[in-house]
Amino acid sequence: MCIVYIGDKYGIATTDVTTGDFFVTEVDSERKLLDELNRFSPTEIICNEPFYMSGVDIDDMKERMGIAVSALDSWYFGDDLAKETLLSHFHVQSLEGLGLMDYDCGVIASAALLKYLYETQKNTLSNILELRPYSIGKYMIIDSSSRRNLELVETMREKQKRGSLLWVLDKTKTAMGARLLRSYVEQPLIDKTEILKRQELITNLNDQEITREELREYLGPIYDLERLITRITYQTANPRDMIAFCNSLEMLPPIKTLLEDLKGELATGIREHFDCLEDLCALLKSSINDDPPISVRDGNIIKTGYNEEVDRLRNASTDGKKWLADLEGKEREKTGIKNLRIKYNKVFGYYLEVTNSFKDQVPDYYVRKQTLTNAERYITPELKELEDTILGSQDRLVELEYDLFRQIRDTIADNVARIQATARAVAQIDVFVSLALVAGRNNYCKPKINESGVIDIKGGRHPVVEKMIVNDMFIDNDTYLDNHNNRISIITGPNMAGKSTYMRQSALIVLMAQIGSFVPAESANIGIVDRIFTRVGASDDLASGQSTFMVEMNEVANILRNATANSLLILDEIGRGTSTFDGLSIAWAVVEYISNPKLLGAKTLFATHYHELTELEGKLNSVNNYCIAVKEKGDDIVFLRKIVKGGADKSYGIQVAKLAGIPELVINRAKDIVNQLSANDITETVKNISVEGQASGKKKKPHLDEVDLTQMSLFDTVKDDDIIQELRDVDISHMTPMDALNKLYELQNKVKNRW
């Protein structure tokens, strides 16, 4: 990846030299830049010197993200050189032909990246044939925290594919399809038309199950065409690579035939770019042996009948064995030496070997070459001439086969554009066959897509969890959010009851719908969202010196600053990393902020153990309470995993602790303590707090929607006027230190007793 920072803009060029993919875009903020880094996960970044002064945390890139970052000399980033480099490489007359009219920084980044690759790869980069500009507004934005929390492509703990969304969806048969599907998962669409095109093709494949299964059968033997053609163009492909390539090409005609059965705009587009490459397949089948060696210098690469000279030299090599056998028989008969043998080694070539018992019968025209303990080795003029013929033909044959192989490889490389287009078409059909298969096997439904902001999921299921559980049944749940009276759902209930799973499943269903996939639900009507944010769990970031609470607050700050009214927020246990009062205050204020359409107004699922937040239902029109249903059996509980309307009145923390195996002595003591604390419950106080920041009987402040977010304390439960007056009356100048200490102790006790 190359990043160029010029005039508050970042030009970003990204390539994968193994496949020839080359992308370019521009962004105008550090946050958007980080989103692109998360999208592509580059291993190396080159940049201009001003990038180091742009405010981006480059040390974080190197240490946390594991990216090698280095600045290039300024001459790499000249305007004239950039234009010249791109026009020359892509063989066009103007940048307009590349679609780069609006990408000034992107042009410089792309050209600098090409120049860098010329120098480091030491080749012409002939597999990079297309530069694809894209707008970040074309895709849903998912930041690194949300990608991690939703476990899109790997699990949070084990960093494994199994247990991720990609693991569920990926039933692709080719490496190209697997890469493309991953990019779909990481880059959901926000264009309704494009989403519906994908849905149409998946529906078509579901309706034609026989066609779908036949496509899978023919896709299976196809090797990684994108990387094979890269090796071919870089002249590193060996004979076995060419056979793998040929075997892959043989699968293309039946796939093309099956594609004729599919309807729709996307299917038509795939067919148009699908070249069966029959001429290349015929060339390889006629020229390369079916089981060639790995090395191009080992010979036996070219098929008999492809080249007359190869056939002649190969016959000479084959006939040479007969010639040697005839010579051996003739010399035995002439000399009477019955155990005479013609042998070969790399030092002496061919020679006649005679044991010591017959050496007296050796004729004068035998020339001794080597004496052994039990034998003598000789050559003759006739054997030497025969050796020159045989070995010379073998050397010439190996060299000729190598030259012919290179010519064939170059012919294939000249067709790189056709091959890459077909490889992309194969990858696309592989992805949609996989998504159709998963939809059918897992009983997914085709979601409706709307632009009105309504998210209505009936019988939704978590796509990963339902595949991981073995001896239990996954309980489905409904979700309803819109841009009006159902903007925020506050979800309460005990730990382990399923709040986090429910919220994640809702986010994943929305994301899957915008991929174009079917979704795990009875029915779904999904309003397109521009971003998904998740704040689920937190841990210390010791490397940067941040506590759990600071990590949490950083994530919340990022969400509140970057979310829009069209975003979906998944917020779990906001404020739990600090004291109860501070945490509740922050959570309350966050809900108020999100609910205000003039400030944010995003659709939100908000899980909390602060039951006091349920008082916001009725105070804020857009807030609704939901909880996880629990069945009590004495001191025990059963999690029903069902989301129901209303707020939970208990956290069941002690019961969960009991399930976890906490000693009974601790459980009993906890029950005693909770009973004492319940007497000082603040819930009744919270009921009297208005979202306008006023308590009963006090002067009304301006409404939140009208002015600002200024709030009174949620916990105005202690009347301290008498203590304040007593402090005013204290005559400090006439008190001894001991008197002052006693007075302080007395006032402190009064305050403690009131709490």
List where the protein language model places each region:
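Short amphipathic alpha-helical segments with heptad-repeat character
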Residues: R182, R314, K384-E387, L391-V398, ...
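ATPase nucleotide-binding head domains, primarily ABC-like/P-loop NTPase cores
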Residues: Y103, K173-T174, Y184, T355-L383, ...
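Amphipathic heptad-repeat alpha-helical coiled-coil/stalk segments that mediate oligomerization
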Residues: F77-T85, V92, I141, N247-K322, ...
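C-terminal tails and terminal domains of large nucleic-acid-associated
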Residues: S713-W755
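Conserved catalytic alpha/beta cores of large enzymes that bind or transform nucleotide phosphates
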Residues: P42-F51, V56-D59, A71, E382-N415, ...
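Charged, surface-exposed helical/loop "interaction arms" that form contiguous linear patches used
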Residues: Y234, N238, S248-M251, T304-G305, ...
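Short hinge/gating elements
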Residues: F23, H91-D102, E151-T155, L165-L169, ...
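Charged catalytic and DNA/RNA-contacting regions of genome-maintenance
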Residues: M1-N204, G220-T233, A237-G329, Q694-D705, ...
